Structure formats: C-alpha cells, structure tokens
Design a protein with these regions (language model features):
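Conserved Rossmann-fold NAD(P)-dependent oxidoreductase catalytic core, especially the SDR/UDP-sugar
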Residues: 67, 90-124
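C-terminal substrate-binding subdomain of Rossmann-fold SDR/epimerase-dehydratase oxidoreductases
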Residues: 172-284
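N-terminal Rossmann NAD(P)H-binding glycine-rich loop of SDR-like oxidoreductase domains
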Residues: 6-25
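Active-site helix of classical SDR
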Residues: 127-130
Length: 284
C-alpha cells in the first residue's frame, strides 16, 4: 500500500505509535490525539473524536480511518462503565456516521481483542464486541469497507507500562514479590508492538476488506510461566505469590487457537521475542 492518506485516531498511543511508524514510510499520515506523537514526518492535529468540526474535516480528507483511541485499561474500564461505552463504542458509531456522508469511498480499520473468544465478560470486552457488531452492521448497510483485527496481548516499543510483562519486569528488577491472581495457568498470546504494526500493514495491503481477523503470534505462555521466565532472565530474587485460588471473574484465558474459526485468523511469526524484550527493558 502506497500514497494513501491515512487518519490515525489515537496515533500517539502505544499501538498507534508503532503503526504510525510503519505506515508513514509509504503513506501520508495524520494523527489525531490529545498528545503530540514521539515520531516525526507525520501531521499532528490536537483533539479527539468528540471534536466534531475537526473530525468531519479530517475524515473527508483521508481515505483510511484507523481508530486506536479507546479506554484499554481493564481495571479503569470496569470502574468507569459509562465513559468506556462512550469512548469505545459510541465514538465508533459517530465516526461511521461521518464516513457515511462522505462523497468519496472510505475504509475503517478497527482493532479489537482476541479475548472476545473467551467465556468471561467484562465491560472492556463487551464494548469491543458491541463496536464490532455496530461496524459490521452499519458498514454493510452503507457499503463502507472495513477490517476488524482482534489483537492479542501486546508489549514492546512505546509501551504504556500497564501490561503484564512491564508490571512483572518492574517488580523483578526491584526484587519485589510478583503477585498472580488464581493458579497462574491463564494463558496469553503475546505479540510485540512492531510485529503488530507490520501485521496491520499487511492487513491493510492485502484483500481483507469486510473481514474480522484474529491476529495471533507464535508466542503463547501462561501467567505463571511468564513470571518464572522474567525472574530467570533478570536473575531476580523475587518470589512469585498466588493471591488466591480463584482467578478474577473478568480474567481472560487464551487456551487454544481451536476456539477461533478457520479462515479468520492470521498467525504472525514473531521477529521480536519476549526474551529479547525483557533484556532490553532491563537495560533501559
């Protein structure tokens, strides 16, 4: 994909920054965000998707709309239900309505979560699932092209320091106890932000129009083994403590690719491993 005008809403954030860094090489990138991005050679507009005048103008000028702006902290989401629905679901509806009235054909790219495949529900996954259903319904009705990518647990460059790897590395670096909810057997599929960015570039390049794709890496670990791996690599004296036998009601588990329908997944080979990332984090 080359020479496309792409609007990235929330492009200064963790995943948005990584994707912007890849896409800017061959395209014209505009980032709409509250904070200035840490990357150069992109156009920055301060604001959010509730700035109606700005968003109208930017959507009209761009061909592809990528929406990363959302509440992604699960604990915050569970405590702020209304705000989460407003920012994660209502905003998507408003963006689609603005795309609908444009004369030129647009495409929307929406990052969702592979943990929608799990049995447990919380306000974060509910907001993502609701957004997916709204996108599929409205895009079909208004003939708007879309791609929905269900993303795994992401770590790496531009990290927001709220993911499980960052939390465990910080504890282990200070030889503090690493706390685990439940048995620690809950599995996660992990993917580096640069690998995610390259995979999203691939999804935008190839014919994935009007599809929901589960993006997976070749790195799946349970939480207990992740903690042990981090302690070993860092050579930490940290002890691993299980807080209780029962896991949190809203905890996710990625048990198997078998839960994901054939033909709707993309397995991406990791160039940036967890081990390599842990070593880099301890040096920084």
């Amino acid at each position: 994909m080359k020479d496309k005008k792409i609007l990235i809403i929330g492009g200064s954030g963790f995943i948005g920054s990584a994707v912007s860094s890849i896409l800017k090489k061959n395209n014209f990138i505009t980032i709409l965000d509250q904070k200035k991005p840490k990357i150069d050679n992109v156009k920055f507009i301060k604001g959010n998707f509730f700035n109606s005048t700005k968003i109208d103008r930017l959507i009209k000028k761009n061909q592809i709309i990528i929406v990363f702006a959302a509440i992604s902290n699960i604990n915050f989401a569970n405590k702020n239900t209304v705000k989460t629905i407003e920012q994660n679901t209502l905003a998507i509806t408003q963006i689609l309505e603005k795309i609908r009235v444009c004369k030129e054909k647009k495409k929307i790219f929406f990052p969702s979560s592979i943990y929608l495949h799990g049995k447990n529900s919380d306000i974060y996954t509910i907001s993502k699932l609701a957004s997916e259903l709204i996108i599929i319904s409205l895009c079909k009705k208004y003939k708007i092209n879309y791609t929905i990518a269900r993303l795994p647990t992401i770590y790496g460059t531009f990290n927001r320091a709220e993911d499980v790897i960052s939390i465990f590395v910080k504890k282990a670096s200070k030889n503090k106890k690493i706390m685990i909810h439940g048995t620690g057997k809950q599995q996660r599929n992990f993917m580096h932000s640069e690998d995610v960015a390259n995979a999203i570039n691939h999804l935008l390049n190839k014919n994935y129009n009007n599809k929901v794709i589960s993006l997976l890496s070749d790195q799946t670990l349970n939480i207990l083994n992740l903690a042990k791996k981090i302690v070993k690599i860092i050579k930490s004296k940290s002890k691993i403590k299980k807080l209780n036998k029962a896991k949190r009601y809203d905890d996710f588990n990625f048990s198997s690719n078998r839960d994901i329908k054939e033909g709707s997944k993309l397995i991406w080979k990791s160039k940036n491993t967890i081990e390599k990332n842990i070593k880099l984090m301890t040096k920084s």
